[in-house]
């Protein structure tokens, strides 16, 4: 998969275009994305989110996939528009939640919008956690740990500082991970974590 060959179905394309237009109209009253990325939203946000789709684990009955700090809906809403049906978009900001609900309505996405902080989510309820441009890897692991099932995974796209974040996180956690090169930036990687546990400082 590469940036030049990435494509969507006609229906997905239409819904994603509606979604992008909605972001631009709401951006005037709610800060959804960086202003400098508005003109390059398709590559910078949509494709950057969509590339996660084939990295997600199979849907597990009775469990969900949390998008923590969903903000404007990247990556979760894009993945839902592409057909993923177990997503819960978690966003603590009420105005951003209002936007997400409107985007869900306009695109008819099969997704749950929850105005909630990650710390308040039910334990052991997710088979995967995703997050994009939310917090450091170490903080994301701290938030994700109680939410995941035993075989749950974390999928976190990270930018130019991915290596620094990973090294810092490894001071606090034993991490079983693999890297997938981002198709939207040569300096970025997607960190897929299949298993992790806190390092016991008492040892």
Segments (PLM) and residue ranges:
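Residue-level signal for inorganic ion chemistry
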Residues: 23, 79, 158
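Conserved SAM/SAH cofactor-binding pocket of Class I
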Residues: 50-131
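Short amphipathic alpha-helical segments
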Residues: 101-102, 141-143, 167-168
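Short alpha-helix immediately C-terminal to the canonical SAM-binding loop
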Residues: 96-98, 137, 162
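Class I SAM-dependent transferase core
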Residues: 1-62, 66, 95-109
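Conserved beta-strand signature within the Rossmann-like core of class I S-adenosyl-L-methionine
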Residues: 151-162
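Active-site capping/gating segments
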Residues: 88, 161-203
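A short glycine-rich, Lys/Arg-flanked "PGG" loop and its adjoining helix->strand segment in the class I
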Residues: 141-153
């Amino acid at each position: 998969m590469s940036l030049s060959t990435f494509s969507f179905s006609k229906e997905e394309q239409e819904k994603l275009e509606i979604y992008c237009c909605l972001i631009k109209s709401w951006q005037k009253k709610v800060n959804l994305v960086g202003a400098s990325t508005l003109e390059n939203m398709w590559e910078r946000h949509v494709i950057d989110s969509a590339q996660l789709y084939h990295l997600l684990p199979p849907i597990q009955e009775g469990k969900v996939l949390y998008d923590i700090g969903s903000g404007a809906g990247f990556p979760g809403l894009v993945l839902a528009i592409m057909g993923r049906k177990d997503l819960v978009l978690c966003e603590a900001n009420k105005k951003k939640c209002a936007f997400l609900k409107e985007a869900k309505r306009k695109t008819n996405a099969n997704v749950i919008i929850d105005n909630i902080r990650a710390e308040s989510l039910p334990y052991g309820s997710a088979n995967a956690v995703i997050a994009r441009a939310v917090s450091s890897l170490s903080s994301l692991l701290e938030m994700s740990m109680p939410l995941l099932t035993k075989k749950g995974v974390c999928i976190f796209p990270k930018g130019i500082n991915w290596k620094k974040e990973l090294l810092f996180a490894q001071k606090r956690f034993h991490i079983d991970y693999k890297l997938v090169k981002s198709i939207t930036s040569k300096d970025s990687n997607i960190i897929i974590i299949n298993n992790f546990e806190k390092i016991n400082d008492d040892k």
